[in-house]
Amino acid sequence: MSEHKKPLVLMILDGWGYREDEQSNAILAANTPVLDELWATRPRTLISASGFDVGLPDGQMGNSEVGHVNLGAGRVVYQDFTRITKAINDGEFDSTPALVDNIDKAVSADKAVHIMGLLSPGGVHSHEDHIVASIELAAKRGAKEVYFHGFLDGRDTPPRSAKASIERIEAVFAKLQCGRLASLIGRYYAMDRDNRWNRVEKAYNLLTLAQGDFSYPTGVSALEAAYERDENDEFVAASTITPAGAEPVQINDGDTVIFANFRADRAREITRAFVEPNFDGFAKQKSPALSAFVMMTEYAADIDAPVAFGPTPLVNVLGEWFEKHGKTQLRISETEKYAHVTFFFSGGREDEFNGETRELIPSPQVATYDLQPEMNSEMLTDKLVAAIKSGKYDAIICNYPNGDMVGHSGVFAAAVKACEAVDHCIGRVVAALNKYGGEALITADHGNAEQMANLKTGQAHTAHTSEPVPFIYVGRDATASEGKALSDVAPTMLHLMGMEQPTEMTGKPIMTLK
């Protein structure tokens, strides 16, 4: 007869942050007797789920994708933005092979280096610090002609806020004396993602043919003229920047182009126009034979171009480590968070590991979840209790989506009901563990439901927060450590299961058995 396993259950309460202020706090307003008792009587602490602690920029709120990647990886997983910024700060950026080698190619052939990208401090698709670092690197490598082609933001930044960024770039060139700002166009044209090729064509022709609707001597004068035409940053018409006595800049044969955006979705189309031999989005008037077109990150696996910061495969994430040690695992959630407990928790892997089972509970078909704040949590719990009873699993990873999905609605009363529904379900799970054997860790991936209104404006607060999240151990006697983060959860699970930790996991157990 097969062994009856007593599982360690990781319950991830999505969007369940910790905030002591009762104002607009749906979690504190909710009647949660189960969690209240566990918090009062069990080993517990608070852990960080935002900012540097999860590989995001300092102060940036957490999110579900980043949270689950860190939970499953057992190490801080740096997001592309943070990786590149860190490389600049550490000096490693200046020796990145894809950048150095391809700048050098253009320099040795006496050709130009063109940097293009979203000129913005927004940090969503790009960051102007990365653009400045790229321009400075080209100058350090001896490029005599360095040109920047700016795409203006106004979506991830205020609609008319580009002036300071343009002034910064013009100051960089004034200092370096080896090139200039060459063109400006709104991201509406250069960064389409819906195959609106007529928009992309305008940007491509500006870059390769210096074909603009307007020409100005400076970037600031171009921007001011755009505002006169009532164009916000995002929609600025194609403008060449041509000082008196200078020629408009075109991207020509032998030049190197560096695309400084790090987010892929809106970088792909214009990249394909440059690099794909059989490109058919529009009829190109010019196809420069470049020394290289360098992508800052991998925009798509099928784009054949050098990548400065390639994907970093995560080795020995928790699921893989379980597989290597013959452990069985269940991943279970509703539709809304199913990808998070599978793909993201597995470090970006679609396939199941050996010994892994997946259980998908359909989320309710309602327009918004405030209409059914309990979602399908009872159905999810039925399956979870059955899995505990079955004795088949060494570990179970479960996500209750309610705090986040109802939190996003901004409806306070519904968020309170969502929290109460989850608390009731936790009671059922703990009762099943007491009856059939097993232990639980209860935590969250980021905050949300603990702040449902902006206290200054009174408007609904529908976003995530940067609050810490609870971490409770329902099991043996243990001591909790302070100052931990999501990346310490997988090492905690291994410690409680009596398993060694892979060297790739740099997190440390949050709970130590007494």
UniProtKB/Swiss-Prot annotation:
Residue positions of the active site: 64
Pathway: Carbohydrate degradation; glycolysis; pyruvate from D-glyceraldehyde 3-phosphate: step 3/5
GO molecular function: manganese ion binding; phosphoglycerate mutase activity
Residues the entry annotates as binding Mn(2+) 2: 14, 64, 445-446
Enzyme nomenclature, EC number: 5.4.2.12
SUPFAM superfamilies cross-referenced by the UniProt entry: 2,3-Bisphosphoglycerate-independent phosphoglycerate mutase, substrate-binding domain, Alkaline phosphatase-like
Binding, substrate: 125, 155-156, 187, 193, 263-266, 337
Extent of the signal sequence: none
Catalyzed reactions per annotation: (2R)-2-phosphoglycerate = (2R)-3-phosphoglycerate
Gene Ontology biological-process annotations: glucose catabolic process; glycolytic process
Binding site for Mn(2+) 1: 404, 408, 464
InterPro entries for the chain: Alkaline_phosphatase_core_sf, BPG-indep_PGM_N, Metalloenzyme, PGAM_B_sf, Pgm_bpd_ind
Cofactor (UniProt): Mn(2+)
UniProt entry keywords in alphabetical sequence: Glycolysis, Isomerase, Manganese, Metal-binding
Source species, domain of life: Bacteria
Cofactor note: Binds 2 manganese ions per subunit.
A Pfam family per the record: Metalloenzyme
Cellular component terms per the entry's GO annotation: cytosol
Similarity comment text for this entry: Belongs to the BPG-independent phosphoglycerate mutase family.
Quaternary structure annotation from Swiss-Prot or TrEMBL: Monomer.
Function statement: Catalyzes the interconversion of 2-phosphoglycerate and 3-phosphoglycerate.
Full protein name: 2,3-bisphosphoglycerate-independent phosphoglycerate mutase
UniProt source species: Pseudoalteromonas translucida (strain TAC 125)
